Amino acid sequence: MRGASGESVLPEDLRSRVLERIRPTRLQFSMLGRLYSLVARALEECEDLRLSIPSYRVELVGSAAKGTLLRDKWEVDVFLLLDAPREEVRRLGESLLRSCLGGRLPYYFKYSEHPYATVSLMGMQADVVPAPLAVDPRDAVGVERTPFHTRYVRSRLEERPWLVDDILLFKSFLKGIGVYGAETRVGGFSGYLAEVLIIHHGGFEETVKAASSWRPPVMVDTTSGKADLDMLARRYPDSPIIVPDPVDPSRNTAASVTPKRLAELVHAANIFLRKPSPTFFHALQPGEPCRRTLPGVMVLMSGNYSDHPPDSVWGRLKRLGERLYRATKARGYPALSYSFYTDEALEAAVYIHMESPSRYPIEGRLGPPPWERERAARFTEKRLGEGGWVWIGDDGRLSGARPYTGSAAGDVERALATLPLPPGTRSYKVVTCPSTGPCGFPSYLEALRDPTPPWLRHVLGGCRS
């Protein structure tokens, strides 16, 4: 992509500098290949597996198989494709993996739409996923499509191998601005979606330029007219962006993208086109935090979160943040936004950003019309009994006000008593941060208090030392 002067928007020296930091190394591929071989051998030599489901295939999938993994990702995805009905795979998958991996490799289980094992060895990880062996991607559901996605991307990159670098750049860009990942924690762009967009638009700069002009609802037809976009719009009415899956055009591969993450990409793309900077790319971002924190209220939770699926914990945290934000606004506090965090092990937190964790000392109340005699009498007695005020407005209804002596922390405590907490939570406490200064939290929790992305402060000069 060229700018008005005919020069590339991404300077060549910056492109080279970023790629030098994010390209996977030969050593990385070699070691990950060895990890895959160890896992594949454990599965292929597993007698219990051969006796239970004789026909199966072990397949390397995902970014490592496509050559599109970032240098800091020492992970492989291994699918155990079983020639058996989906129900049987779900019934036997976990026990078979335990039998095949036990005693040979260190592993632990995670639970998503399929239970899967994570082998952890020498700082590397291999996710081992049992799935039914599907012949047609239209018969696959969820992660079962991953082998088809891998084959599709590999075939396109064999035709245009130079796009590998552009995919790496785009993934690093998405990661740098905080919108990379389809999991609930992020609600952003999956690695596969990033690859599909680069293949469709023909490069990193072309994709960023296209994104800069997006306005919801966004439609990006990556299927050369094979997809029924009207049908997809009806099927995914809440999706701000629809990108048909090239291997199954009836599916929106951008279904995980939230309005917030789409808007963040559009905003970042426009700023990047105006002011390219290494700070947009995750591998070149400054190590020192760049923050200007806001006052507010922090809810600190502790529990056993590792016993629950991460998406379940993150999803509940997000809903808790939304409801506390609405509750504090409804109580008259100048709430601005919210953020949330969990280490997926022992702690979680929600922070409500506010102009100030205080509110007006008077609270208004709308009452009934006087002809609703009992209600009107109760309303009047209650307001005056509180040392407040009562009057009749121009609309003929009773109105009132009362002194308000509550606190933001107290109101959040009362709201928490009625709201579902993340699964595994054992206890919590509420802390008020009255100013923009430090509130005594560890750095990763203080980061929740600044709703402005660090990259944005660095790029546009809002970061003060």
From Swiss-Prot:
Catalyzes the addition and repair of the essential 3'-terminal CCA sequence in tRNAs without using a nucleic acid template. Adds these three nucleotides in the order of C, C, and A to the tRNA nucleotide-73, using CTP and ATP as substrates and producing inorganic pyrophosphate. tRNA 3'-terminal CCA addition is required both for tRNA processing and repair. Also involved in tRNA surveillance by mediating tandem CCA addition to generate a CCACCA at the 3' terminus of unstable tRNAs. While stable tRNAs receive only 3'-terminal CCA, unstable tRNAs are marked with CCACCA and rapidly degraded. Keywords: ATP-binding, Magnesium, Metal-binding, Nucleotide-binding, Nucleotidyltransferase, RNA repair, RNA-binding, Transferase, tRNA processing. This is CCA-adding enzyme. The keyword Transferase applies. Its EC number is 2.7.7.72. Its cofactor is Mg(2+). The gene is cca. ATP binds at residues 63, 66, 149, 171, 180. It catalyses: a tRNA precursor + 2 CTP + ATP = a tRNA with a 3' CCA end + 3 diphosphate; a tRNA with a 3' CCA end + 2 CTP + ATP = a tRNA with a 3' CCACCA end + 3 diphosphate. It comes from the Archaea. Homodimer. GO terms for biological process: RNA repair; tRNA 3'-terminal CCA addition. It holds the Pfam family NTP_transf_2. A single active site specifically recognizes both ATP and CTP and is responsible for their addition. InterPro entries: CCA-adding_arc, CCA_tRNA_nucleotrans_2, NT_2-5OAS_ClassI-CCAase, NT_sf, NuclTrfase_I-like_C, Polymerase_NTP_transf_dom, tRNA_NucTransf2. GO terms for molecular function: ATP binding; CCA tRNA nucleotidyltransferase activity; magnesium ion binding; tRNA binding. CTP binds at residues 63, 66, 149, 171, 180. The keyword RNA-binding applies. Belongs to the tRNA nucleotidyltransferase/poly(A) polymerase family. Archaeal CCA-adding enzyme subfamily. Mg(2+) binds at residues 75, 77, 127.
